[in-house]
């Protein structure tokens, strides 16, 4: 019997080897992103089909990485075998923490339905709008795995917002990454899943599926923000709003995943079919800007309303299949949402938290003060700290037992312009006085309030600086000077976001500067004879709105100071050209719920 056992073992090994053939090195050109034949999809989920060394552009200051593009086997929401692409990023520097290097499985948000919008292609070009979050994870020394989801390969179609398929895709991206030669990624090392918006939905679906789809993986925590967990409420929220493109994209993506269940050709009119076809060719920002405030009744035969569409049984069943909160999550969860989110309704996110808490999931929920895009990037430091604690094996805290009332949304009304409201955002500011060679730090309680209207491309707001005292060295002596900085008019300018997610701001903030006292002696109206103009100029990724990188700096001129008997002295010390300034604006801190 012994020889038979050896033969059986050999046969089993041969079977496994045949089912999971060695991955091939793919071509260097775009033909790499070709959908493999169905016969290649016979291995286990996460089977690495092909890979290649990749070049990525993460921008200035990024951690040096080794990178690979991968194509791997996964399953979609109908349990069919599919091929999915992605990118694997591993810092070149050795991991200096305890144990093996952890991995962040990064689930991207909406990128657009066209294959050219895929993260793998955007990371190569240096145009991926989520680069800031990926860079932040790499800076911690973590490996980062990014799935493109279904649809980036030639011959494949996007299954946008098909939750089960997306959850499977990110889980299998981690499995595939561990098979990349010399990646150093280990399936036995701790890993965390992080996603926002579409990525938040993906992360939550992956978490619900872990115990059955990937019980062998050491996933220690899931961070999911801006989650569309209730598609019925989310669809109603998006319809007729600035975020209609997400609803239109969902119709296309779910129609691809569930052909026949969303009878688009039967329900859409010619205008609707053309609009959905165009959305299929666009990346996220172009689709967003070109489809604002559309009502789905414009695109349906006989003006069928959203409510009537959702009553169609096959449509209802399809959307219901994307509902979260019904599965158990066995790992800690960090959930977060923007109180002013204009795309994903807050109440259904709160409901999802309660559903998970009721199933004994350990959920920590943070409420961020701003809108959807800002929150995505503002939350990154907190997410990474939370994940670091999970990787370190620390006990996760929970806000499931909060007695606080449900938070109320503060989003700008739907159906209007796309406005990012900066309500009393902390202002970290400094002014450099050229003649004195010294820097004046504005009070830590200074704030900036503005409405950045991306639709109208206008910026309107004001600085708020409390009166303060600053010690300056004058002729070598430390002298305390009282200062008042007040708006001399509204901060005005222009703001725009291009199709690549690049933010551009141009404007001016005029202020009057008054010297209120010297050595404690009050001087009344000893102020600049005309307003000081602080030019506001910024060019950078839209992530800067949330991650603290929104900075306006440069040089300006201070007019003469008049109104008191030492005006001439103060003018000599503080007036003239070449004065420098730095104004950094960041959103307020979140609150627990």
What are these regions (language model features)?
Residues 316-317, 334, 343, 350-419:
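C-terminal catalytic histidine-bearing segment of alpha/beta-hydrolase fold enzymes
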Residues 133, 160-182:
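Alpha/beta-hydrolase active-site loop
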Residues 21-99:
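Catalytic-loop region of hydrolases
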Residues 409-593:
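Extracytosolic secretory-pathway proteins
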Residues 193, 329, 334-341:
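Short beta-strand/loop motif that positions the catalytic acidic residue
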Residues 176-245:
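Primarily recognizes the serine-hydrolase "nucleophile elbow" in alpha/beta-hydrolase
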Residues 37-38, 228-326:
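Accessory cap/linker subdomain of secreted extracellular hydrolases
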Residues 76-85, 89-139:
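Short, surface-exposed "cap/lid" segments of acyl-processing enzymes
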């Amino acid at each position: 019997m012994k020889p038979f056992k050896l033969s059986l073992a050999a046969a089993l090994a041969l079977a496994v080897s045949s089912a999971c053939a060695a991955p091939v090195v793919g071509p260097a050109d775009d033909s790499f992103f070709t959908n493999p034949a169905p016969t290649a999809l016979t291995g286990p989920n996460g089977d690495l089909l092909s890979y290649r060394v990749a070049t990525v552009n993460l921008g200035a200051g990024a951690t040096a990485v080794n990178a690979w593009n991968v194509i791997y086997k996964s399953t979609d929401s109908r349990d069919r075998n599919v091929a999915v692409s992605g990118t694997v990023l591993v810092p070149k520097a050795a991991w200096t923490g305890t144990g093996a290097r952890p991995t962040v499985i990064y689930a991207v948000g909406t990128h657009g339905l066209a294959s050219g919008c895929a993260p793998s292609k955007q990371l190569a070009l240096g145009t991926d709008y989520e680069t800031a979050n990926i860079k932040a994870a790499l800076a911690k020394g973590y490996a980062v795995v990014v799935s493109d989801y279904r649809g980036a390969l030639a011959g494949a179609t996007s299954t946008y917002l098909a939750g089960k398929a997306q959850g499977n895709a990110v889980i299998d991206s981690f499995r595939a990454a561990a098979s990349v030669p010399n990646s150093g990624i280990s399936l036995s090392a701790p890993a965390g899943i992080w996603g926002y918006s579409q990525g938040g939905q993906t992360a939550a679906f992956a978490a619900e599926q872990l115990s059955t789809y990937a019980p062998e993986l050491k996933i220690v925590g899931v961070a999911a923000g801006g989650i569309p967990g209730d598609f019925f409420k989310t669809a109603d929220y998006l319809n007729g709003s600035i975020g209609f493109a997400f609803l239109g994209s969902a119709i296309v993506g779910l129609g691809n995943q569930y052909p026949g269940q969303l009878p688009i050709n039967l329900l859409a009119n010619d205008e609707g079919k053309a609009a959905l076809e165009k959305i299929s060719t666009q990346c996220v920002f172009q689709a967003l800007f070109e489809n604002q405030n559309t009502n789905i009744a414009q695109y349906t035969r006989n003006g069928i309303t959203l409510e009537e569409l959702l009553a169609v049984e096959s449509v209802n069943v399809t959307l219901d299949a994307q509902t979260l909160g019904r599965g158990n999550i066995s790992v800690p969860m960090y959930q977060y949402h923007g109180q002013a989110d204009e795309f994903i309704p807050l109440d259904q996110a709160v409901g999802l938290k309660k559903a998970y808490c009721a199933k004994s999931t350990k959920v920590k929920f943070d409420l961020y003060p701003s809108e959807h895009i800002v929150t995505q990037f503002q939350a990154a430091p907190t997410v990474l700290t939370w994940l670091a604690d999970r990787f370190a094996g620390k006990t996760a805290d929970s806000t499931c037992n909060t007695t606080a009332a449900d938070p109320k949304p503060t989003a700008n009304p739907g159906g209007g312009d796309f406005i990012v409201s900066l309500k009393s955002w902390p202002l970290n500011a400094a002014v450099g006085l050229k003649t004195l060679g010294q820097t004046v730090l504005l009070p830590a309680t200074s704030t900036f309030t503005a409405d950045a209207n991306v639709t109208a491309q206008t910026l309107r707001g004001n600085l708020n600086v409390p009166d303060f005292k600053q010690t300056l060295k004058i002729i070598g002596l430390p002298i305390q000077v009282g200062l008042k900085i007040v708006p001399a008019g509204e901060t005005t300018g222009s703001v725009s976001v291009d199709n690549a997610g690049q933010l551009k701001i141009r404007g001016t903030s005029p202020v009057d500067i008054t010297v209120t006292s010297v050595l404690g002696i009050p001087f009344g109206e000893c102020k600049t004879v005309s307003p000081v103009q602080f030019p506001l100029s910024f060019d950078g990724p839209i992530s800067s709105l949330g991650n603290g990188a929104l900075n306006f700096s440069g040089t300006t001129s201070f007019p003469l100071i008049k109104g008191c008997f030492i005006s001439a002295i103060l003018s000599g010390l503080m007036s003239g050209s070449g004065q420098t300034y730095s104004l950094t604006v960041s959103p307020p801190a979140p609150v627990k719920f």
